[in-house]
Amino acid sequence: MLLGSTCIVYILLTGIHCTSGFVHTWGYHHGVMPKRWGVLYSTCEGKHQSPIDIRKRDVVYDQNLQLFNLNDLDRIDDVMAKLENNGHSVVVHLSDKRLRVTGGSLPGAYNVSQFHFHWGSVNSQGSEHKINGRHSSMEMHLVMHSDKFKSVKEAMNTTNGLAVLGFFIDVGDYNDEFESIIRNLRNIQHKNDSVIIKALSLTDLFPQTTYYYRYSGSLTTPPCYESVIWTVFVNHIYISQYQLDQFHSLGKNHFKGSEDLINNYRNPQPLNGRRVTTNVRLLYGES
């Protein structure tokens, strides 16, 4: 608990009462919420923040955007995967230097660190990025760091140190590839719960990855460093309503000192003159 003058200053800056158990922590519903993240992390008020609303009419076709090489992501025979509830998301940790992504007009090779999910409380919201003002039900982020660095932590404050592949997720047919994750959500009901799961073939989780949007942005959670090359894929992942509901159910299972794990997404940030490009030609009437 903060006391005396420190408490007064904190209230003036954040509008949050000092007795809150979430003081000095960021969150989506408690503590320092997204609109005030800049109080704790000044970078969150930067000019190149993520996510964004991708407006198709403003996207620029770039014929030089290359296809991705994702072949290394199938090397899973002895890769351990840890599924974790970190209090802000469901995260699958996959730290292994052999899991690399090249191509995609990235400035070199990027090593996979983890992937995680953002979702809402209803099907019509949950993704962080939007397309023409529309949310998807969820969004999956594959977080990578340049192979010039040993870790995400080391790379996160360096220009182009990180690259994130973003995938929209909506409701459709049952998706067998997500079974290992869905089945184990019951084992990570509370913050800091984790479980080792069967290693996944990442490319089996992905939709078709030929077409994408590209822009320069930031981490979508504090410290919001503006070091991310963003790729948001055009094609969506589909899971069943039952599978989506298993993520929604995490919002009902928490304990004192943690927030509901639901609606864990940041709203779109201003473009501030940034250009969004794509390798989708016909979609935008380019000749």
Give the ranges of each region predicted by the language model.
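Alpha-carbonic anhydrase
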Residues: 2-287
